Amino acid sequence: MSKNNPDNNNLFNKALSNKNEKNKFFLDTAGGNSSLVYFGKDNFIEIDCVRLDTIDIPEKIKLFKVEAEGFEPEVLYGAEKKLNNIEYISVDFGSERGMDQKNTVIEVNSFLLSNNFKLYKFSNHRTVGLYKKDSLE
């Protein structure tokens, strides 16, 4: 990161959520599916979660990428006040939520459409959507 942008590095050891609180982060030791949503594995660690709205970040954001293993709605709800300053949002909302492995397509799509984003591109291969803000404030 310092090579690409040496004067503007801010790292936060926090998970994004819709609440500022400690939460269980369930660990998947056999793959990359660790999540804040219980998916049948009892091994977890306690982590600090924060709303993106509470973090001092640059005024304008070109791309906000959300890949939260089924926790995408909560991440976006916690970013609601920042949405007016984000041009693009990429969301991986595949079948990863909880023990039933539900997708979050309908909930995420409804939320983003109601916040003046339009679905720009969609990939069935990985269930990823790219949304573009109608107009930035």
What is the predicted function of each stretch?
Residues 1-137:
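Phosphate/nucleotide-binding beta-alpha loop and adjacent structural elements of enzyme active sites
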